[in-house]
Amino acid sequence: MTIVGHILGFPRIGLHRELKYALEYYWDGKIKEDKLLEIGRTLRIRHWKQQKDSGIDWISVGDFAWYDHVLTTSLMLNNIPDRHRIGQENINLNTLFRISRGYSLDKKLIPPSEMKKWFNTNYHYIVPEFVPNQEFKLNWTQLFDEIDEALSLKYTVKPILLGPISYLWLGKIKGKKFDRLSLLPNLLSVYQEILDILLSKNIDWIQIDEPILVLELPLQWLNAYLSAYEQLHGKVKLLLTTYFDSIYHQLDIITRLKIDGLHVDLVSNPDNIPLLHARLPKHWTLSAGVVNGRNVWKTNLHDWFKKLYPLVGERSLWIGSSCSLLHSPIDLNTEIKLDKHIKEWFAFALQKCYEIKMLCAALNAENTSDATYEDTLSEYYISNNLRSYSSTIHNIQVKKRLEHIDEISYSRSSPYTTRVTLQHKKLNLPLFPTTTIGSFPQTEEIRKLRSRFKNNQINKEDYHLNIKNYIKKIIMEQEKLDLDILVHGEPERNDMVEYFGENLNGFIFTQNGWVQSYGSRCVKPPVIIGDISRSKPITIEWISYAQSLTNKPIKGILTGPVTIMSWSFPREDMQRKTIALQLALSIRDEVIDLEKSGIGIIQIDEPALREGLPLKRSDQKQYLEWAINVFRITVSSVKDDTQIHTHMCYSEFSDIIYAILALDADVISIEAARSDEKILKSIRHVIKNLNEIGPGIYDIHSPNKPTQNDLIRRINQLLKYIPEQRLWINPDCGLKTRSWPEIKHSLNNMVSAAKLLRKQFYSS
């Protein structure tokens, strides 16, 4: 039996982020739809060829998406919220963008669908919406069109389809509550139709993704798998695909399914290969996800060879990535500035394809007693074996400081009830204080300035002078808007994680290591390669300068340790807890220096706190314990009258509400504008125990411009759950990606709405 290689998906954005720019040009009206479609087609053809040239046997089709793959699935199933059908006879590309971004109709804002994190990654998906008695039907033909494209180029095609049970689980109910599984029979009829079409195209295998099987699911959802795959089996061979965690707890159910193969993320749990082999039906194909799709380190191919070799000849075996390579940068060969010794430690998406080819070749060759491949695998990883001796990754002072971590208090010196009185006296803020989350528009001019400085085209003095001029403008604009708490706007920061990584020891940075976060939004995560420490203050110059320009309080913005770790590519030779503690000590030093410089409000952004939560509930308690302690170590040194804020992004806050309480931040702002009242309803039983909260009164990711009345309605909604003395008024996220005209309009209406309601409360 020949062992074949495949991947679970390939990055779609393009080596130079071509898809990002094409989407933004299209949204801005700078290119037509036919040009956008042409760019997408060019990217797909290039990516298929790259996979084939790298030695991949089955070419994945269906991983390309104009915004995200879950939304693509919704369109294929004709699951379009009624508010996005208005004025549109047929589903088209603009329908997709309406759902993901929102739009205006007759001066009325039509909100986008909710956006959520894709499991425990920094990728986001647009949440499907379900109503009682909803009917699905086959509509959007993107998958079939792309299969035809690939077949015309003579590739061996493996279509990718999000499975029906996971699709239902990932969605949300709109309106009256009902059992989402009641929609399954109708949904399965559409999936059968899809499989019939694939059969007519002579498709042999389909990758059907059911990632929720790694969760600890209710029994009725597990039982739904049995009937669903009984119904779907027999048309095209089904490779049931799971990722991001182990599925050993579900083997009793999985082994009863009518499928033809199973993909398992072995990176998450590599030690149970013998158990898998013993438990899975002998006629099934086992797809071994051994190349990490979520990190950039080389794979220890020789180690995997030894683990997988006993299966050779015993069953049908595929070698694959642990998950989609969507979460990986594309090509290491473009990183011409990386130190060559450090570069040898890494593998990006194309190199990961080559790793799969190498492992397949070695396992296949072993069938013919050719052992030379095994030596090649050992040589491939030798640089990573030597890494543990590198002075680049070790810092004795950091290790010594960690040894004494228990000497640091995990708590503020006084409880919130004491602190709040001192803080209110010092800050003298009105009811419904207004602020922003931190960043202001990153104009082309600012980006060019940073690029020129990075490329040594201007000196440090000129760069600092220009950045301070931008800060001055940002302060002036905020004062004109009459915001209560100001920020310096972060013009010096390219990215909230990359900026801090650049100013800490233990990180390296890529030129082209971009990965998609959502839609056209891409991030370039730094790589943590060694022990982390702070050599000098990072933000003091900019934030202190901002405070010198105004009598209003300036809020210093820092990225928190858990988020820096989660949004970087972490070390694989160190536990996440230890990495986070190293970061906590570094950011703690910055907090101390900010307070010494006279900054009385400090915000520690932790948007990734929920994201880092293990997928299995039984594993979550331990993570939350150390994540909470990491945050508290970061801020425990400050005085009682220093106000500590934190900010969190798209999250199921009900899952971690007690952890949020345990952070003991004075003010928390959350990204909740897309969620209507859902988040507040889910935590209403503990809101009385929260300190102060700013839920976000408008969605900055949508181009919609909220009116004053829109914002008043939103604030009144919030007041049903939050006492007025504890409610802050703010956008739901940073303003980096918006234009100045947009934010002036929205913030002016936000401040006006707060003032109007403030007046009503003071006079009542």
From Swiss-Prot:
Keyword annotations of the record: Amino-acid biosynthesis, Metal-binding, Methionine biosynthesis, Methyltransferase, Repeat, Transferase, Zinc
GO MF annotation, one: zinc ion binding
Membrane spanning stretches: none
E.C. no: 2.1.1.14
Binding site for L-methionine: 437-439, 490, 605
Highest taxon listed in the record's lineage: Bacteria
Enzyme class label: transferase
Pfam families in UniProt: Meth_synt_1, Meth_synt_2
Binding sites annotated in the UniProt record for L-homocysteine: 437-439, 490, 605
Binding site for 5-methyltetrahydropteroyltri-L-glutamate: 17-20, 117, 521-522, 567, 611
Family, per entry: Belongs to the vitamin-B12 independent methionine synthase family.
Name of this protein: 5-methyltetrahydropteroyltriglutamate--homocysteine methyltransferase
Gene: metE
